[in-house]
């Protein structure tokens, strides 16, 4: 079973199943309708999508055929439900700690993130006690047998921390990289502040030139 050949929609589907298994276990496994809603929800998703039932069903069918998702047909219900077998089950080759599971889940539904972002967004999945705990889990995911499962990306402009990205989605299918809104806002503010600083310096230079011209009688 290959863990490195999932496309973007398949990754979003697995991430949502992992998330709901932890955060709303009483509603898990998920029906197709519930899974579509989970994939397209506005909060805790990057990018926000508008996947159709057909797109999600196609992804589910592909994942079921590869043993990464199981379809459950309960005798008392006409609606099929789905649960993942991606990790941490008796059928999974991939066994992750709770911290590692939270990180992979977050990356599957929100893309590349910094250690600080992973810690602040993981509350319902896993309670990281420190940034060091996040770093240790990331290091483990980089060195696990069969990995690396995450990789460190180049530093973004205007960003102090570097982001980590999962290594499961094929690069050709990955959405175009974009800076987070927080990063973009921060970088824009820095540029605006620099422009104002330069404008103030130019104004002072012009004033000084005028003073020198007046003093020389020009």
Swiss-Prot record:
Entry similarity comment: Belongs to the UPF0502 family.
Organism: Marinomonas sp. (strain MWYL1)
Identification of the protein by name: UPF0502 protein Mmwyl1_3509
Superkingdom field: Bacteria
């Amino acid at each position: 079973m290959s863990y490195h050949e999932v496309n973007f929609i398949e990754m979003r589907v697995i991430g949502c199943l992992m998330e709901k298994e932890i955060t709303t276990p009483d509603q898990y496994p998920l029906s197709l309708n519930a899974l579509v809603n989970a994939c397209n929800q506005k909060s805790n998703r990057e990018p926000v999508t508008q996947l159709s039932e057909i797109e999600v069903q196609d992804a589910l069918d592909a994942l079921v055929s590869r043993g990464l998702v199981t379809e459950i047909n309960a005798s008392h219900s006409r609606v099929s439900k789905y649960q993942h077998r991606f990790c941490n089950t008796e059928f999974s080759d991939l066994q992750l700690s709770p911290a590692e599971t939270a990180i992979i889940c977050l990356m599957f539904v929100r893309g590349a993130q910094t250690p600080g972002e992973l810690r602040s967004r993981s509350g319902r999945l896993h309670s990281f006690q420190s940034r060091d705990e996040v770093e240790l889990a990331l290091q483990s995911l980089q060195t696990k047998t069969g990995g690396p499962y995450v990789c460190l990306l180049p530093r973004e402009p205007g960003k102090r921390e570097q982001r980590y990205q999962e290594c499961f989605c094929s690069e050709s299918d990955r959405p175009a990289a974009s800076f987070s809104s927080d990063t973009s806002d921060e970088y824009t503010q820095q540029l605006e502040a620099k422009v104002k600083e330069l404008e103030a310096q130019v104004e002072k230079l012009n004033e000084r030139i005028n003073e020198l011209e007046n003093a020389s009688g020009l």
